[in-house]
Structure formats: C-alpha cells, structure tokens
Amino acid sequence: MSIHSASPITRRKSRKIWVGNVPVGGDAPIAVQSMTNTETCDVAATVAQIRRLEDAGADIVRVSVPDMDAAEAFGKIKQQVNVPLVADIHFDYRIALRVAELGVDCLRINPGNIGREDRVKAVVDAARERNIPIRIGVNAGSLEKDLQKKYGEPTPEALLESAMRHVDHLDKLDFQNFKVSVKASDVFMAVAAYRLLARQIEQPLHLGITEAGGLRSGTVKSAVGLGMLLAEGIGDTIRISLAADPVEEIKVGFDILKSLHLRSRGINFIACPSCSRQNFDVVKTMNELEGRLEDLLVPMDVAVIGCVVNGPGEAKEAHVGLTGGTPNLVYIDGKPSQKLTNDNLVDELERLIRQKAAEKAEADASLIARG
C-alpha cells in the first residue's frame, strides 16, 4: 500500500455529537484533544496554555474545574479562546450547572461521584437546555464502591458495568447527547473495556490510556493501546495522557492517527535510523528539520534516507525525498529533482519542502473549491 493511500480501516458506526463547532463521531475526523495542567484560577496562564494547544492543532481542550472559584475563572477563560472547552467536573454538581451558564462546550462528569440521581438529572437538564454534550468518564481508579466490592479489583467488566449503569441513567432521562470513556492505566484492561463497550452502545467513544506515564513511556503505552483500538475502527476522539507538556499530547495524538492513515496534519517524516553507509548526518538533519518545520500544517510525506540502499525507493513514494549519495539526490513527487552537497543541506532541504508545501496547499485548496 502506498504511503499516500487512504486508511484501510473501517470505523465503527456511531452517533455524531457536537462539542462546540467540532463534530465527534459519525463520519467526522477523529478529534485530538488535551487537558490544561495550569491552575484554572490563573486565567492568564491557562489562556496562554490553551492558545499553545490551539497552535499545535488541538480540536478540543479540557479544563479542570474543582470549585466555584475555578468555575468563575472558566467563564473568563472561555471568552478569550476559540477552541471548544470541556469542563472536568467531580463531586459538586453545582459546578456543572454554573459552567453551563457560562458557555461550556461539553461537561465531563463521573456520575459515580456526582451524587444522588436528582443531582445527575439537574446536570442533564442544564445540558439539554443549552444543547451541551456530556462525557461519561469512567476510570479504573475511581470505580463505584459496590463495583469494587463485586469484582475485587478493576476489570474490563467492572468498567463496562459502570459505564452502562450511567448510560442507562441517561437513557431513562431521554438524553442521547453524550460520549463515553472507560479508561485504565493498564493497556490490556483499557483495550478490553473499550471493545466490550463498543458492542453495547452507539454513542461516540473517547479513547485514552489514563495516567500513561512520562513522555517516552506514556507515548509508547498510548500508541500501543489506542493503536490497537483505532486499527479495529474503535474511537471517535482521543486524548494522550502524558506527564509532560500538554502540547506533546497533541503531537503524539496526530502522529498516531498519521501512522494509521486516519488523519494527517503536518509532515509525516520517513527516516532511516542511520548506519555507517550514511552520506550525511541523518539524525542531526532530522532533528533540525523537525524543529524548523513544526509550523507546517499541510499533510505531506518527507523521506530522509542516508544512503542508496533504501533511499531511492522511499524517496520515490514521498512528496519530497532525500537520498544520501555523492552528491545527495532530492526527489520531488517521486522524480529526481536536484543534487545537493552536504554544505547547507538542511537549509536547502527546508526551502524545497516549504516550496512543495505551498504548492500542495494551493492545489488542495483548488480541489476543494471545485468540489
């Protein structure tokens, strides 16, 4: 299959809901989201971080709202950003009611800790009145006490039962504008729980491996777990949970979707790990290009291969390809274009990539305009 091919994955059929102006589920692209890690009451810091996430491509951003002071701050934050905001609510249902008044785009609640059914109903009524979707967020670390007693420990079945308990509650209230997550820090538990849930409901699924770890370990866990589910067509929106800069969550999320041909944003680099055959410093070249070209949003493939063993083959499949040699050879759209020496290699390659990106953006826009 060509690297330019559409994804062979058939996605699970699900209802479409709207988080602000972002569709989730149905035939919508898989949305990538993150969560702020600033103090919500520090409005300036939170707004600054959300804007960085917007610049990185976040479709949706979640903000923790632990108390009423944070709820008031949330209202101020909402006025200063463009990306849809989800309010993360625990324990006090009145916080959900307040942020609903302040224009929240989605409410993330864990019905297990919101309290009595009348409180859940109050939240649902507020959401219905303003057409605000709800995310039922079930987590292995906060299962209801009766389920902990029944199962002895978190299991996929326990996560499913918790989720279905709350789905049934919303069904009884005739509320269908919701999505569901069943997260665990263990990859196999999370994957099994999502598979079970996908068979039970038609609502969109929010995927995540919770508390996955630091940048490296969390990326690996999330790529494995979410990759398994996404390859099966399961999942409508994703959040990569990392103990790192939230911007990294967006980058990793798009990289996972890129690798499965589910969604493209920016450059998809194909690069060799390098060996003694390399005719230029592949690692240094890649590091410099990735840093310099982060601002490019046009989906395109760039191959950086150090020698002629695999270089020509990979370069011919990319929009822009570099093959090491004496001198090095650049391919544009699969055809040899020009030779480059190692002098100013990165500068010249960056120039050619940006030139191709501009041409591709213009061609893509023209194609869309023609319908």
Swiss-Prot record:
Pathway per its UniProt entry is:
Isoprenoid biosynthesis; isopentenyl diphosphate biosynthesis via DXP pathway; isopentenyl diphosphate from 1-deoxy-D-xylulose 5-phosphate: step 5/6
Q: Where does [4Fe-4S] cluster bind?
A: C272, C275, C307, E314
Cofactor binding remark: Binds 1 [4Fe-4S] cluster.
Give start-end of the signal peptide: none
Q: Which family does it belong to?
A: Belongs to the IspG family.
Q: Note the SUPFAM superfamilies from the entry.
A: Dihydropteroate synthetase-like, Nitrite and sulphite reductase 4Fe-4S domain-like
Which Gene Ontology molecular-function terms are recorded? 4 iron, 4 sulfur cluster binding; 4-hydroxy-3-methylbut-2-en-1-yl diphosphate synthase activity (ferredoxin); 4-hydroxy-3-methylbut-2-enyl-diphosphate synthase activity (flavodoxin); iron ion binding
EC nos: 1.17.7.3
Single Gene Ontology BP term? Answer: isopentenyl diphosphate biosynthetic process, methylerythritol 4-phosphate pathway
Transferase as UniProt keyword? no
At the highest ranks, the source species' classification is: Bacteria, Pseudomonadati, Pseudomonadota, Gammaproteobacteria, Pseudomonadales
Question: Which species does the entry assign this protein to?
Answer: Pseudomonas paraeruginosa (strain DSM 24068 / PA7)
**Stored InterPro entries:** Dihydropteroate_synth-like_sf, IspG_bac, IspG_bac-typ, NO2/SO3_Rdtase_4Fe4S_sf
Name of protein: 4-hydroxy-3-methylbut-2-en-1-yl diphosphate synthase (flavodoxin)
